[in-house]
């Protein structure tokens, strides 16, 4: 166990796992339709600046001996110091070492595989050399944007994103065109698998294979089957990197079946996955009291942006409508929306055009909107993992944040108890007033 400035990092090199990947029974398969065209980095990159990571460390990005184009992009985007996760992962990752990393939300995991892949890429027109898989369309879209931002000065590198929502023929057209074919493919398992299966995406030249939020994909049999088939279509010798905020011992073992002697980095023990700088409270109330209390909180709390989580599409739609009736700048995202509309709404929220987002758990994992500093669980999450991913929307990159969970039933109370036991935290009752200095970054 190596103690870092404010985190515990467990780092180890594991032995090669000789086990074959197991086969799984057929499961219901959802093939997601496709996505926008590949972007070259002559296109305008997202100019949104996140600022420096939390903590001041002696190690700077220059110490990683990255390409000048990458260092220029890092500086241009306002990053100054690597996070603890990046300090431990990047030096090995850029050498092609397999990486298995568990780190809490907001610690810069995405930049690890983006920088490692871009550092090593040798683009050849018509060849896909990097595949990144993730479990939602929104996350795929966001990761594609991160590649675009960091490769803004690598004008010969093209990134494409493939997910459901548009006809697959659009993706097939891009991949068939040597001048448009992306060198980096970000996608959801269903759509990527369909393109590989139909021999439209040639994975035989892939050198880097990445799973983000890997537990979500490997726990679901249909997604796991798709991931395995894509994996088998790639060369035996390649770099494999997997990342998530939560990794059970079983899933860790599954991950390592895809890898050869991976560097394993576990930031904070699983039982201590708390978010630094995040104030967490709960509030007991009746179901019928939720709307009035939410109204009071939105009136009285100071916030940049707030995420409100509910348990169903219907409740998301109804609560969003109610908030708009009360003149709150609200918008909602849920699985019932057409893909183009979901992406449009996500962009509006990220661009600060709306300050309140009502969402189902589809928005809970991996989605990064840096201005969010308050999360309200209007409906309790289903389990401790879901809670972690929801409240992780606030307090990104070690900044301050506030999470409030409504508890209105015995079942809610049980979930709260499991959360406290799992993460060894005591979540107190919401006081009459909360000092804004404790959750607003000055």
Swiss-Prot record:
UniProt keyword list: ATP-binding, Helicase, Hydrolase, mRNA processing, mRNA splicing, mRNA transport, Nucleotide-binding, Nucleus, RNA-binding, Spliceosome, Transport
Subcellular location: Nucleus
Ranges of residues in domain Helicase ATP-binding: 90-265
Main location class: nucleus
InterPro entries the record matches: DEAD/DEAH_box_helicase_dom, Helicase_ATP-bd, Helicase_C-like, P-loop_NTPase, RNA_helicase_DEAD_Q_motif
Motif DECD box mapped to chain: 212-215
Free-text note regarding domains: The Q motif is unique to and characteristic of the DEAD box family of RNA helicases and controls ATP binding and hydrolysis.
Protein name per Swiss-Prot or TrEMBL: ATP-dependent RNA helicase SUB2
Species name: Cryptococcus neoformans var. neoformans serotype D (strain B-3501A)
Organism classification: Eukaryota, Fungi, Dikarya, Basidiomycota, Agaricomycotina
